[in-house]
Amino acid sequence: MITSYIGYAVFYFTRKSFNFVMPAMLTDLGLQKADIGIMGTAFYLTYGVSKFLSGVLGDRSNPRYFMGFGLMMTGVVNILFGMSSSVFMFITLWMINAFFQGWGWPPCSKILNTWYSRNERGLWWAIWNTSHNLGGALIPILSGAVALYWGWRYGMIVPGIIACAIGFALCFLLRDRPTSMG
């Protein structure tokens, strides 16, 4: 559970990093608030579709690779976002990020249902469900501080690098069921 907890918390790093670098982006690139609105709308529409599709795909996949690959992809997208400058690329990349963001929850749900009995699930789901609070609480500090000292681009790139590293680790450390522990 610890591995999926950390992994899902880091999904929030790559989901919310944009929120904390956006003011600097507006100033640095001269973006309009409407551009930011389009990015947000495109993200949430794509994320909604992805949550449905990834639930179907996640049922047929090994959670460790599904979640790990999804997190690595959101990391790559955040890195590319930090290297981009055009509104078109921002929107495109943020939609790709949204698609892979949908890959976080289904494997976690599958793992929690596999690892814990009905009588235990309430407690473990409650504990696990704080993972997004942890990720959401840490990313403003991380992304904001990095953006303050090294610019908004690194405020996207650094969380992306962390996501790639944790996603890679998930592929080796996350276990889909107790029997896979040996």
Language-model-detected regions and their locations in the chain:
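Small-residue-rich segments within alpha-helical transmembrane domains of MFS-like 12-TM solute carriers
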Residues: 12, 16, 82, 98-106, ...
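Interfacial helix-cap and linker-helix signal at transmembrane-aqueous boundaries
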Residues: 25-26, 57-58, 145-150
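Helix-loop-helix hairpin linking two adjacent transmembrane segments in secondary transporters
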Residues: 128-179
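MFS-fold secondary transporters
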Residues: 77-81, 97, 170-171
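Cytoplasmic helix-loop-helix junction between adjacent transmembrane helices
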Residues: 93-134
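Residue-level signature of mid-helix packing/kink "hotspots" within the transmembrane helices
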Residues: 16, 44-52, 136-137
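Extracytoplasmic
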Residues: 3-33, 54
